[in-house]
Amino acid sequence: MIAAHCLRCGVALVDRHDGERTRRTCPACGWVFYDNPLPVVAAIVEHEGAVILVRNHGWPEKMFALVTGFLERDETPEAGVLREVREELGLEGEVVSLIGVYDFTMRNELIVAFHVRATGTIVLGAELADHRRVAKEKLRPWPLGTGLAVRDWLARQT
């Protein structure tokens, strides 16, 4: 998200070069919009012997990915990933392990990925159009974003 106006005084921000980067800055009070990456949690969800991939509304018909979501204020990454699994799949989960932390610079996000074991009956949340069950041996990583977490998790399975 790019800020257009100062959060302190409401004046329109301007681009100002600070020697290293160009940043959105308030010409009236000097406030700087740093546009820091947003923390996102991601889950490789194991449920009844398969990995669950999901498809959001608006995504292409064959595009599936991991359960993901933005970390909330005052929430640990572990609590956030379990909340996302509950909200998106209706499942209760337990964090098995941290898989890794991945930059996703094209979306200005920092992904914190976990392996989660889940139980219960899948009930898709409002954000999701579909889900797919994939056997571990058939799961294939994709070259960016959460696909890197899939790659690293699969490497640890053998």
Residue ranges and their predicted role:
Residues 1-42:
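Acidic, metal-coordinating catalytic segment for phosphate/diphosphate chemistry
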Residues 16-17, 92-100:
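A short coil-to-beta-strand element that immediately follows conserved catalytic motifs
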Residues 8, 25, 52-53, 65, ...:
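Conserved beta-strand segments that form the floor/walls of ligand-binding pockets within enzyme
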Residues 69, 83, 96, 134-137:
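Structural detector for helix-capping/boundary residues
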Residues 46-87:
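Conserved Nudix-box catalytic region and its N-terminal flanking loop in Nudix hydrolases
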Residues 124-155:
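NUDIX/MutT-family hydrolases
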